[in-house]
Amino acid sequence: MLRFRLILASLLCLCLSGATAAATDIKTTPLYARIKASLDAVPAIDTHDHLRPFAEIPNQDDTDRGRGVTLHSIFAGSYFGGIHRLSPWPAGKSFDEWWKVGSHDFDNARATSSYRYLLPAFRDLYGVDFDTITAEQARDLNDRIFANYKDDKWLNDVVTRRANIELMFIDSYWARLQFARAYQYSVPLLNVTEIMSGTHRSHFSDSDSPYLYAEQRGMKIENLDDYLAVVEKLFVDAVAADAVCLKSTQAYQRTLRYEDVPKPLAQVAFGKPANKLTPEELKDFQDFMFWQVLKLSAKYELPFQIHTGHGRLQGSSPMMLVDAIQANPKTKFILFHGGFPWIGETGAIAMRHRNVWIDSVWLPTLSYTMGKRAYQEWLEVMPADRLMWGADTVQAEGIYAATEFTRQCLAEALAEKVERGELREDHALRIGRQILRDNALKLFPKLKRQLWRKDVPAVTSAQ
């Protein structure tokens, strides 16, 4: 009996010890602090953003003091409005007019990642705890934001110094066929989303039109072969402009299941405006063009960033791309957003196919908990050199917030694995640097000649 009691007491102590350890927030430990400090010191390469030239920063409000960026603008340019109601700014009115209604927009959002990811920006950039903000503090915060956007100094300082970003891929969906660089840290890419739907010139605006692009270069588009020649010329020009990859967001409009459609079926659709196309004809054309783009992606060594998951859930599972991935081993596929919510499936795809990379862009801001779980699961099933990240937003505060949230999420995921004995600390530091910077340099070798920072620290190791 005594022996039984001793064994029972020992088991109880072990259970209590385990419960205490499990209840400890890893972010309060010295281990987490070391890993987070190491990740903070990495000049990151942000593989996806939508930062416009400064004069075109979106979501500005017409206030009683003129047009500018407001506290409302920060939330309007974030993911908050995709999940929660965001009261519009009353045109020409004061901050107080908006705040007396808008302050209640956050009541049911406090636990959501789409709200919480912005808190580090208010805390670190402005010294404000938004969870406990008063009307007076909110008014002052709004005034400071408005003043900061009088010129581009604040924006550039936040991106390069506070967020510690060295290079940023900018998906200029508002001018897809231009490769201008508005900032020292800009990296161009070629967005092929609309090209894959271009059965007729009426499909395009002037800023996106391959038909206008062809005319400006003395090329004609009279049939599908002409169109394909112009598309390939676009790839040639993109490479010459140092574009580093391709991007598609067609999953917002249609399924990711692309069949290898023969050319004659695509020719049926070509030349028809949208109002003359059947849904089947449009899909056939898009499917055909997708496979053409896959071939050009391999030929011109432009890895292909593909939106998967959240946005339009129907048909957006990355599993629908597996046949195309398997049939095009020389094309480098980058599955955006980790396929949220299908993070396990995305990891399995990367595990089985060496031509697949995963970009965690957007994931922590959709669900911090799922983001942390994804990092841990992916690192268990695939090599660490095929994971990346991106901020995916439109102004300084959003960029800082998404960057800080990602560094925190990644540091927490790595620290937990170290604490459980699943990873050495020095290996965790290396993996963190790979995800934030080195993996992009490896996948996109052109980036090396675009680096401009002189103060990049060497790889840190645990002592």
Task: Show the residue positions of the predicted features.
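Histidine-centered catalytic micro-motifs
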Residues: 43-56, 304-309
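Bacterial N-terminal signal peptides
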Residues: 7-17
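Divalent metal-coordination and catalytic microenvironments
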Residues: 48, 168, 246, 307, ...
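Alpha-helical scaffold segments that flank or form the walls of functional sites
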Residues: 40, 61-183, 209, 224-242
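Histidine/acidic residue-rich metal-binding segments in metalloenzymes
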Residues: 153-159, 222-248, 255-356, 370-388, ...
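Boundary at the C-terminal end of the N-terminal hydrophobic targeting segment
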Residues: 18-23
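Active-site beta-loop-alpha junctions enriched in small/polar residues
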Residues: 50, 173, 191-197, 249-253, ...
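Mid-to-C-terminal alpha-helical segments outside catalytic/metal-binding sites
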Residues: 25-45, 54, 61, 69-125, ...
